[in-house]
């Protein structure tokens, strides 16, 4: 029997002019409910593109993006609820002051200028905190507008 469950996720983008923000908010609630149901059985790790820069530290130009998909107040509040319900941002737990990104627009030479967003996460059930050995964001790996993220757990 497995001791933890892993879920990969792509969180819906709220899109230009926030056309899908309402849908995104409903999706967030349903996804959190799903995760909490899984957690009844065993601890959960979920990872992927959460399409939110959780804090000003997680985005290069916070003020200019406050009304843009991925950095709205509503999206950041939903991320905060995930944490309030017992899930931990593994990277931020280990590196609370590190500014690094996992996504850069293909426009405006954003990657070359490191004008990015941290959108990709490994979130873990609180009960797994002590098992986290490291969490990494591989900014050196190219090939996509996102870079890989990694979670190392003690077994």
Model-derived segments and their meaning:
Residues 1-5:
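Conserved small/polar residues in nucleotide/adenosyl-binding loops
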Residues 10, 122-124, 150-154:
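Short, well-ordered beta-strand micro-motif
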Residues 8-11, 48:
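Short, structured patches in soluble enzyme cores that scaffold and shape functional sites
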Residues 18-23:
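Short, solvent-exposed loop/turn segments at secondary-structure boundaries
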Residues 27-115, 119:
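Metal-dependent phosphoesterases centered on the DNase I-like endonuclease/exonuclease/phosphatase
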Residues 129-131:
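Short helix-loop capping/hinge motifs at secondary-structure junctions, enriched
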Residues 136-155:
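Surface polyanion/phosphate-binding segment centered on an Asp-His-Pro turn
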């Amino acid at each position: 029997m497995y001791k933890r469950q892993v879920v990969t996720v792509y969180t819906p983008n709220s899109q230009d002019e926030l056309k899908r923000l309402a849908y995104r908010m409903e999706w967030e609630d349903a996804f959190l409910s799903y995760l909490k149901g899984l957690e009844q059985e065993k601890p959960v790790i979920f990872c992927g593109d959460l399409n939110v820069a959780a804090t000003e530290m997680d985005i290069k130009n916070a003020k200019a993006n406050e009304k843009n998909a991925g950095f709205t107040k509503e999206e950041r509040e939903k991320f905060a609820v995930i944490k309030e319900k017992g899930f931990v941002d593994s990277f931020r737990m280990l590196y609370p002051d590190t500014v690094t990104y996992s996504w850069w627009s293909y426009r405006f030479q954003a990657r070359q200028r490191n004008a990015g967003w941290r959108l990709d996460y490994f979130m873990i059930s609180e009960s797994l905190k002590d098992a986290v050995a490291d969490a990494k964001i591989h900014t050196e790996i190219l090939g996509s507008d996102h870079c890989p993220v990694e979670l190392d757990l003690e077994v």
